[in-house]
Amino acid sequence: MSSDSQVLYSQIPAIDTLLRTPACAALQAQYGSQLVTQALRSLQQQARHAIQRQQALPDWCVDWGVACTRRLAETLQPAMRRVFNLTGTVLHTNLGRALLPDTAIAAAAGAMGAPVTLEYDLDDAGRGHRDRAIADRLCALTGAEDACIVNNNAAAVLLMLATLAPGRDVIVSRGELVEIGGAFRIPDVMTQAGCRLREVGTTNRTHLHDYRQAIGEHSALLMKVHTSNYAIAGFTAAVSEAELAALGQEYGLPVISDLGSGSLLDMAHYGLPAEPMPQRMLADGVDLVSFSGDKLLGGPQAGIIVGRRELIHRLQRHPLKRALRCGKMTLAALDATLQLYQQPEKLRQALPTLRHLTREASEIAACGERLLARLRPHYEEAFVLTLEPCLSQIGSGSLPVDRLPSHAITLTPRDGRGGTLTALADRWRALPCPVIGRLQEGKLWLDLRCLDDEQALLQELCQ
């Protein structure tokens, strides 16, 4: 070790010395001595590494109290941070999908802070079933005989297959063997559920006789999978739920449908592309339908199964159900969300997902004009700022080919360098409330469809 290094190492204060400084004493009063000591030790280690690499102490060593304050803030920063979703994807999987309505947030908070009747029957003063009250609400909304709730739609599919088809064949069209995000594939789920995939038809065309020919002594289920994250167009043919349900009744085989997203609303009434509705599937004779809580429904993450009472009871009794069940916060939020569907006149304003999906392009453009006037003085030296029409997408595998007319503020670097644009995007992601846009065509796009608080955004971008 060189004499210069020895001098530098000697300038790193001891932990006890630092803890006795007024700044660190104040931090201990706020955060406790253990956490402050850990922060100081990590700073010491960082300083030693700097000496080893650069033969110099970091600049922050002039004030260890300030450095410790910053390190504590980093340590205690929430794992999930609030962001501005200006990506143009309404139901962004990586950003948490649906925003909960205020009533659902309040219901979840209420369930967290007090004892609730999660599995308690007030009438009988005995144990109840945690799905019961919500199941009744789902039955009223969908016309189902009963319902079952698990923690996501993948779990719903797994539970249906594991309960109804262990060791037996499940017949599915080859064109419906979907893969969703995270390499979640229907064939893999079938393997984990202990059943066998029986593919029928071709990628683009499947007929009723394909299903009929595949039925045999080992058949357990006929299954429909909604291709929610891709579309097959052109020379195509598919079997409807009503046709498949009639075939299932003929052979005594249950028919299940995985809607993926699913919607309790006729989206066409709101000027949006149509999405399959579980109540219509049940009316067509499908025995069980599964769909998500945190996509078009606009609630918390959950997998919802509705359909025949006898089959639902079998699902409830399966050992996997306990492993896949939802907690009280999820159930409280889901119940509050479903209550809004029983008051449809309030739905458009009360449900953030529906509000964002149906926001008029003219309203978004007006918002963009207001923001543009405020942002230009701060950024126009390095960037050209414009308001441009664009197309938002629904996201989370819902209506993959459909787009929503929107407007975005775009920033184009005057120096023409992509690095300038990337640096801006990096800087905005490092803000106290990160701003997430999208880089495309040499521009940074801020799609304003999902922006609810203009002033909060300006506070971040103009500070």
UniProtKB/Swiss-Prot annotation:
The gene is selA. Coiled coil: none annotated. It is an enzyme of class 2 (transferase). Pfam families: Se-cys_synth_N (PF12390), SelA (PF03841). Its cofactor is pyridoxal 5'-phosphate. One of its GO terms (biological process) is selenocysteine incorporation. Keywords: Cytoplasm, Protein biosynthesis, Pyridoxal phosphate, Selenium, Transferase. Pathway: Aminoacyl-tRNA biosynthesis; selenocysteinyl-tRNA(Sec) biosynthesis; selenocysteinyl-tRNA(Sec) from L-seryl-tRNA(Sec) (bacterial route): step 1/1. InterPro entries: PyrdxlP-dep_Trfase (IPR015424), PyrdxlP-dep_Trfase_major (IPR015421), SelA-like (IPR018319), SelA_trans (IPR004534), SelA_trans_N_dom (IPR025862). GO terms for cellular component: cytoplasm. This is L-seryl-tRNA(Sec) selenium transferase. HAMAP family: SelA (MF_00423). Converts seryl-tRNA(Sec) to selenocysteinyl-tRNA(Sec) required for selenoprotein biosynthesis. Homodecamer; pentamer of dimers. Binds only one seryl-tRNA(Sec) per dimer. Belongs to the SelA family. The modification N6-(pyridoxal phosphate)lysine is found at K295. One of its GO terms (molecular function) is L-seryl-tRNA(Sec) selenium transferase activity. It is found in: Cytoplasm. It catalyses: L-seryl-tRNA(Sec) + selenophosphate + H(+) = L-selenocysteinyl-tRNA(Sec) + phosphate. Its EC number is 2.9.1.1.
